[in-house]
């Protein structure tokens, strides 16, 4: 999520066993995407677009504690029949601000409760998302900042920890942007993929992010598609390597406005679908959303319907966002807890995130 959302998150912070995935090269015809769900935000609060993340084990916004993240996920799965959650977290938090260091027992333990909560909800995909914008404290990974080995160290540990659960997917990095050399970034992604597979996570999905905030509209023209197409598993294949794309629907594609102006089909998802089909690959939309407004209900539903109609190349989507966001946040999809303990979805979640998938 981009800068203004970081600001909203910072404000909140201040105030507050599935069968192995099938090959991405052999997607069966389907009436809708395989995975649909939401982000469960909180552990990423305090992370800026420059790759600084300020939360510690004592200050963290833990969606499992303050926001009943377990109850939210249980509701989305059991009541709404969604089946996927993306679980954003800051790199620094996981290693207690020690670049290249071991997972911090306390911090990683808190996050592990969220991952296990996702699994226990019955979800079929639980995405670990490192929410650092291809950076550590302002410096780009593999391009003047942290070395590839230091980034690989994080992913090797996470893959080792979760290698035996095929519901866990690995989202290499949230929204790389202004990366000078996309080929070098692809080398970084390749190093991570190799480390994850060699750690024993041989079948899980790995999500590959491109440049320009991993924009679905820019993915082909900015060279991300070409560069990331060269990323392979150790056996040379690309099974379960899925391109990770984002796209918002407001006037500047920032995901900071409550009004939507486009369904992103003609300028983003149709060209991407054509390219994916030609190249026998798949993508997943792990961030998108809008306000609880008539315009967003129209356009966001149309976008999801298009993804469903092209499920041979789109694996799924996770909307932004539920978890630690309260009802004042512009793009909130956090369900509202009722007096009887049940949950009521926001308007956009009910109509589009849930409805456009459930009714496909």
Would you name each region that the model predicts?
Residues 288-289, 320-324:
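Acidic carboxylate-rich catalytic motifs and surrounding loops in phosphoryl-/glycosyl-chemistry enzymes
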Residues 44, 249, 323:
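Short loop/turn segments at secondary-structure transitions that flank enzyme active sites
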Residues 65, 149-160, 164-169, 173-315, ...:
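Extracellular glycoside hydrolase catalytic/binding regions
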